[in-house]
Structure formats: C-alpha cells, structure tokens
UniProtKB/Swiss-Prot annotation:
Family from the record: Belongs to the UPF0303 family.
Domain of life: Bacteria
PANTHER family from the UniProt entry: PTHR28255, UPF0303 PROTEIN YBR137W (PTHR28255:SF1)
Disulfide bonds, paired cysteine numbers: none
Protein name, per record: UPF0303 protein BAB1_1430
Organism annotation: Brucella abortus (strain 2308)
InterPro entries to which the protein is assigned, alphabetical: PduO/GlcC-like (IPR005624), PduO/GlcC-like_sf (IPR038084), YBR137W-like (IPR010371)
Lineage of origin: Bacteria, Pseudomonadati, Pseudomonadota, Alphaproteobacteria, Hyphomicrobiales
Cited Gene3D superfamilies: Haem-degrading domain (3.30.450.150)
Amino acid sequence: MAQGDDNKQAIGQIIRQEQALIFPSLDENDAFSLGQRIRDIAVKDKLGIAIDISLWDRRLFFAATAGATADNTEWLRRKFNVVRRFHVSTYRLVLEQNREDRMFAPYKALDVADYALAGGGFPIRVSGAGVIGAVIVSGLPQREDHNLVVRAVAEHVGQDPVALALPAA
C-alpha cells in the first residue's frame, strides 16, 4: 500500500478516535487519574516521557519519567498550542500536512518556536462542552506518543484501546 493510502487510513482512524474518546466530564481528580495511568504505563515499559494534561487556562497534571529531557517539556508546550488552535490531534495534523520539516505551511503564520507539527497532543473533548484542553505526551516517536495517549484516554473513558489504536508503523 502506498504511503498516501496509509496516511488516509490513519487519518480516518484518528478522526474515529477523536469522535469516540469523549469525556462525560473532567475535573482535577479525573486529570490526575488519567495522568497517573499514562505515567504507570511509562514506568512499567521504561519509557522516558513528559506528560501534560491542561485545560485552556491552567495545567492540571504534569509528570516526567526517567529519561525525559528539558526538550520534552518544550515539545509539550508547542503541541498544546497546536491542539488549542485546531482542536484536533496533533498527529492527525502531521499526517494531513504531510511535511518533513515539522512546521506548518507559511500561510498559517504559526511560529515554529510556539507550534510543533508533531504527534502526541490529543484534545480533551467533554460531552456537551466541546474541546476544553489537551492531553500531551512527549519523548517517544510521534506515532507512539499518540498511541500512548489514545490508549490511556480510551481506558479512562471505558472504550476499547485495541479497537481504537493505530497499527504500528
């Protein structure tokens, strides 16, 4: 199968993820539980990552595991800005934009210092409220960052993570 066909299938699956992974509500306790779930997976699998769960106006959860770097926290910030701007998964945008340089097209006027075209940011969509924040992971290859977030969110909201996962690249 051609790369373009693979991307189209992955984009379709990510759209299904975004439609399925709806929170009934989200408060500080939910954010902590979700963040801890991601951290537990990372510790068990020895993944060096940084994790951020934020609403548009404040951070609710942050953690880093052994192996994460200061660069990972910077990537978190830039991925958050992308989710805030577009209200979709950052990996979906990576595949839709199909750019090697990880920068948005110049006509979008998005500074690379503040916006990263990289997977790992996922919108927090609350039933009846819409997108209110983002869950973000940084430290793995971008598809793995994305899959880790989707797995944890799916488990948190009672969806089947295997059915929603993107296949390995």
